[in-house]
């Protein structure tokens, strides 16, 4: 059977769990120890004759390569890409950590706002969004999380209790559509630039996803980790 390893969503989620136990910056963790724990966990599941999703095994092979290079006698200088492999892995874990924290914050905000309404609670719209142009919800979340990290200090000083009616997804959808009528295209950075409160930014982001889901707005990202561009779709 194909299993969901414990409560983990994928190999990065498992690695993040292992890294977080050290309670230090992700770049300070003893990487070989983390790799050994990951491999031990996977081996245990295999010993129990449980089938694993291929992504876990692919990550295991990459981790074994990093571990072997770390433990080889230093008879020669480091391979040019040896350190790059480690840094790339740690960077992915750090990105995933931000994505997961943001996802939890969005879910928390949704739950809090739902308490202010008598209508039945609805699932978060981004969970069912089907994006276009080979982009995924993860791409949008990563871009959004980077922008939110940059605005974290500003939000801290502008923290107030916002009533749900102050920021409504429907209103934000109209705002985005109006801006796209004037500007033709809009980056996610420009869209969120003037947000003073976290709730405002979150509502704008959810409104963007709803417009994309309804195929009223398209997105484009010309390079990995590049700007997310929103454009009005021609009906």
UniProtKB/Swiss-Prot annotation:
Assembly and binders: Component of a cohesin-like complex composed of ScpA, ScpB and the Smc homodimer, in which ScpA and ScpB bind to the head domain of Smc. The presence of the three proteins is required for the association of the complex with DNA.
Q: What does the record give as the organism's lineage?
A: Bacteria, Bacillati, Bacillota, Bacilli, Lactobacillales
Where is the protein localized?
A: Cytoplasm
Tell me the superkingdom of the source: Bacteria
State the protein's name: Segregation and condensation protein A
Gene Ontology CC, one term: cytoplasm
Q: Which UniProt keywords apply?
A: Cell cycle, Cell division, Chromosome partition, Cytoplasm
- Taxonomic source organism: Streptococcus equi subsp. equi (strain 4047)
User: Which gene name does the record give?
Assistant: scpA
Q: What is known about what this protein does? A: Participates in chromosomal partition during cell division. May act via the formation of a condensin-like complex containing Smc and ScpB that pull DNA away from mid-cell into both cell halves.
Please name the InterPro entries in this protein's record: ScpA (IPR003768), ScpA-like_C (IPR023093)
User: GO annotations under biological process?
Assistant: cell division; chromosome segregation; DNA replication
The family note in this entry says: Belongs to the ScpA family.
